[in-house]
């Protein structure tokens, strides 16, 4: 039973073979399949060959071409020098170019031109025979012409003649190029061979024959033309014409080689002549560029300047007076600025020697020094400061021979800011600290000044300068970590060493720092180990107020930081007590009290 499909037929092509076709079409299908297989095999072979060719080109041919290009570039760079050399030596310009070869065969062109010339000559010969007035000489000439015409195709393939190539604008070459006669040679009559019988007539005819050279001599001028050309206007025109003729010089062409379809040629042309205006302009520019730069006048050497012995210089020289006046004016201005208080950072310490006589001696003896010595010795800048101790003023030079001990005594004693020890467990009321107050420092300064006045009458009292807060904040040499007292007075600005400020988390309103010196910490540790409290005795003989201040600095009432007794540790750590110092014990106490 045969079944039929209900589905609609689709328009798509099916590649399946229908088994219901007759067996007569099977050979044709096999042939088609065989052809398809052959085409696929051929295409695969083509792809394989293309891939091989690409690998050969990329791996072998391309590197060789690149190497050849590199080497030829070197050759081109070297030949560039010789090209420039020959151009400059011959005063010419060399240009290389490529010209395509014409499609018309030069041999056929020569044959065509020769046939045209033959037809013209035959027509002339027939006219001469019809008139019956042609001599034997003319017949011989015609025969010679015919012989020349027969020989011309053979000559065309040989080495070209120099005169013909000059007329055509070409130069002799040794390539396979076939020369073509120009249109000028077609229009002119062909050259005729003269007989040797009439020698003088042959010379005359050779002189009258047109040559192939470009530069022809102009005809001789008659008397009328000479009269006309004698005018100035005609002379100007004639000079201009001669200039143009000299400018339009002939160009020679050389064929270097012939490739498949092109000629590689080189043209040799003379350099263009520059116009007078342009030449003058370029000459001016070149003269400016090549000339040496305009320099100022050289300095005139004088006897006073540059001499090796400045001590023999006269003190009344104008140069020396002028320099001395300039220095005096500058020093006067600097002194006025310092007196007016224009210094921005007055709190910066003044760095000078103890005696101060070196600076003052330099300033006072400035006029006695020579110019060369004065230039090399400049005084240091003068800086005043209040917070860094007493400024010593040694204006009086009569007491320069004073003892160094007096100078040392005049210097201020630096104050030590101590480390804070705060007990977090204890209350703030139990804390006791010793801090240097501005009043104590003032008392110390007063006592030092009174001692200095008793020893040396020439020492001056220290002066205080009120400085703005803004300048103190901008001064990088000052320590801004200190706090002001409730009396709004500034504390000492000495550098604080090893300061560690402890902060209380509960109370943030504390304004006073609890500080102790290293000696106090050492004595407290020893006293805690022994179970005693340290007491210091005052050895100051003056009995002044500053002695009480020093005693108050040394006297401390301490409390154990941890709140626990440390008597048990006294046996182990008794070796660190001051009793083992021996003769250095009293010296250590003196150092700790100062």
From Swiss-Prot:
Residues 327-350, 487-506 have a biased composition (Polar residues). Keywords: Cell cycle, Cell division, Centromere, Chromosome, Chromosome partition, Cytoplasm, Cytoskeleton, Kinetochore, Microtubule, Mitosis, Nucleus. It is found in: Chromosome, Centromere, Kinetochore; Cytoplasm, Cytoskeleton, Spindle; Nucleus. GO terms for cellular component: cytoplasm; DASH complex; microtubule; mitotic spindle; mitotic spindle pole body. Pfam families: DASH_Ask1. Residues 122-152, 170-193, 226-249, 288-468, 480-594 are annotated as: Disordered. Residues 313-326, 352-368, 393-403, 449-466 have a biased composition (Low complexity). GO terms for biological process: attachment of spindle microtubules to kinetochore; cell division; filamentous growth; mitotic spindle organization. Component of the DASH complex consisting of ASK1, DAD1, DAD2, DAD3, DAD4, DAM1, DUO1, HSK3, SPC19 and SPC34, with a stoichiometry of one copy of each subunit per complex. Multiple DASH complexes oligomerize to form a ring that encircles spindle microtubules and organizes the rod-like NDC80 complexes of the outer kinetochore. DASH complex oligomerization strengthens microtubule attachments. On cytoplasmic microtubules, DASH complexes appear to form patches instead of rings. Belongs to the DASH complex ASK1 family. Component of the DASH complex that connects microtubules with kinetochores and couples microtubule depolymerisation to chromosome movement; it is involved in retrieving kinetochores to the spindle poles before their re-orientation on the spindle in early mitosis and allows microtubule depolymerization to pull chromosomes apart and resist detachment during anaphase. This is DASH complex subunit ASK1. It comes from Candida albicans (strain SC5314 / ATCC MYA-2876) (Yeast). The lineage of its organism: Eukaryota, Fungi, Dikarya, Ascomycota, Saccharomycotina. The gene is ASK1.
